[in-house]
Amino acid sequence: MKILILCDMFPPAFGPRMGYLCKYMRRAGWEPVVVTEQIDDSTFSFLKGETPVTYVNFFHSKGKILQKLEWICVFILDYFFHYKDKKMAKAASRLLEEGEYAGILCSSYRTFPLPAAQYIAEKYHLPLVIDLRDIVEQYASNEYIAHNFRTFSWLDRKITEIFRHKLLRDRNNALRKAEQVTTISPWHVEKLQAYNPNTELVYNGYDPELFYPEQHRTSQFVITYTGRLISLATRDPRLLFEAVSRLDREKLIDPDQFRIQWYVDAGSKAIIMQAATAYPVARYMDF
């Protein structure tokens, strides 16, 4: 049986949750088919596998100025006319017209492409399952917005307030129409059950083929971080850098015996490197 998956990102981009889900679905006899946004990233290229994927590209410009102008245009069109969701729904509809599907799964860290999934589920009378990896309410500030508006501070706050309201309204409308909702922690479950009581917990995990319990002695002490850093508001590595700096200053560690390994995307790396500039820790880090 085929399952159509709509998601905001999918391998080779930074989308391990859906990437691994597709891997296990195929083993269980399901046929996942994915529609996702085209993102220039190859962090999880090894996870794409044999899953058929339709990539929808919203951004075509080259050069920083044109890219910024294009982003503003897409943002305005999407805010007023659901541009991205309509384009995603159109790509998904073409696939649904070609064969039978048992249902639709939509995974998002914010809201997009939930309205698209809600629309095609209603149009084709298919059950909808929504998976939310992150939600707007968990962020300390406006880290869920990919780009700063960079206008006047008071205007930025107003735009952010209006944008947040729209994100939550669209998300909650889709949640109410879903047959099932899954999310990543008990706190998320509690928040989302207010909009859909059929909300269940599915933790993020590790592929047992790559990570499994093992005991062995090594020549290095390694601290490993896997994931993304959107800002320093909720995940601040400077406390770690301060501790490492102190241990280095007291000559209790050296780079041959102590390493910090980061498995992150390019945006996260830039945040980490910027935060590390005030500390003598670069020689301890690997990316």
Where on the chain are the PLM-derived regions?
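An aromatic- and histidine-rich active-site surface loop
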Residues: F81-M88, I104-Y124, I130-A146
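Membrane-proximal helix-turn-helix segments that form the acceptor-binding/catalytic region
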Residues: K86, K90, Y119-K123, V136-Q138, ...
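N-terminal subdomain of nucleotide-sugar transferases
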Residues: M1-F58, Q180, L247
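Nucleotide-activated donor-binding/catalytic signature segment of Leloir-type glycosyltransferases, i.e.
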Residues: L252-V264, K269-F287
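Carbohydrate-associated surface elements
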Residues: I184-W187, G205
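Conserved donor-binding/catalytic core segment of Leloir-type glycosyltransferases
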Residues: Q215-P237, F241-V244
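Acidic anion/phosphate-binding donor-loop and adjacent secondary structure
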Residues: Q193, Y206-Q220
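Conserved nucleotide-sugar donor-binding subdomain of glycosyltransferases
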Residues: Q67-P113, R157-L168
